[in-house]
Amino acid sequence: MATYPMHVAGLDRDFPICKVTDDLYIGAFIMFGDAELTVRCAEELLKLAEGIDYDYLFTAEAKSIPLIHEMARQSGAKKYFIARKGPKVYMPAPISVEDK
């Protein structure tokens, strides 16, 4: 498989090149299964937030969940929130917003 080398958060990684369209390929930035990369990216993002008074950590569902979890762990946040497309059966009282 072809890869694209990247230097991210002080680490070198080779990301797989994935076809998006007939004319477009990308180096897919994948953190799943890479604990070291997740920890380092969380450190770097928290550095960007230094001096900012925020109330919550909030992310979109799926691929960013390990990252937000690590950011919460490193920052001492007791909770973080995940935006999902719809409620899940295990959510007793989700916050919901209608959109078009």
Regions from the language model: what does each represent?
Residues 1-54:
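Active-site-facing substrate-recognition patch
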Residues 63-66, 87-89:
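Short, catalytically relevant binding-site loops at active-site mouths
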